[in-house]
Amino acid sequence: MKSFIKTSLIYFFIFELIFQFLIFFNFKFIKIPDLFYNGYCDQKYWNFNEREILFNSETEYHPILSYVKKDLAVPKSLKDSFLIEDNNFESNKISLYGSSYLNHKEFKLLINNNENLNYKNYALNSYGLDQIFLSYKLTAHLNQNRTIIFGFLLEDLDRSIFYNRDYEKVLIKNENSEFIITNTPVNIEKKNSSSFDFYLIKFLSNFKNLIKNDFDPRLDKCHISKKEDLLNYYINEILKTSSKFNQKLVFITFNLKEDLIKKPTWRYETTKKLLKNSSIIHVDSYALLKNKSQSNLDEINTYFGDDKHNNKKSFEYIIDDLFRKL
């Protein structure tokens, strides 16, 4: 028995040294974050990640949101808000807040077909739900008496627990039941630095969790309480702010194709229940597309593009449902 333990420890030490050597000298075939970490759970996944997102010339630096669209003049401070004493609601004016789904070229082309509506679109690729929420808080006073549409992938919630993903970003922390905005002003020039780790242990632990979660890292319920607390905070703050500025709220939730093929993750029921309890209009793309497809796999495959986002066909269904509910 002692001999077995000794031999095991020696092999463990050897394999760990091999991992350390390969990673230190940046061998690409082994320096893959998915081998060691879960991108929905571990900050080290993103510290380990060498991928960078490239924005076009239409975006610029922002000290809280990291990046914003240049043409929208987003205030740089949450203290810049003011209230106009005018409750004349303008039903033809809409402001959009979200991530890559509401900023998708197919979505924008379709929604702009309605010439009777006037749009402002604050959505930006890569935004987490925290950045979506803060983009609204920063500009809510500029969009009084309007319909406000939030649209996000359910997994955008997970981005809220990280201070860095494809770039350095804001982090909202819950400290003694008070939510604090940290890591601002954001330093987008800051580079990720991989800290030391025991990679063999991380590899084995990650592999075990992948088996447990049917090789879908989204199914892991890591930090679920923190994520649910943040979601509740966002919704409650949005409700208070929208009431102050006489705004009508609509939420569109998007799902990955895997949710339609198998079943949605815990995020779906959590978000759906919270929106229902808050009496918020909800365009539920999962329920809509599930019903349209009648769970037919071939039909489901026609709803998504090569970029894993919805395509023109499914965006049309979603936008039709949106306009029915406005």
Each language-model region and where it sits:
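Short, amphipathic alpha-helical "lid/cap" segments that border enzyme active or binding sites
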Residues: 129, 133, 228, 232, ...
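Hydrophobic membrane-insertion alpha-helices, especially the h-region
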Residues: 6-23
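Generic structural signal for small/hydrophobic residues in well-ordered secondary structure
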Residues: 99, 132, 148, 242, ...
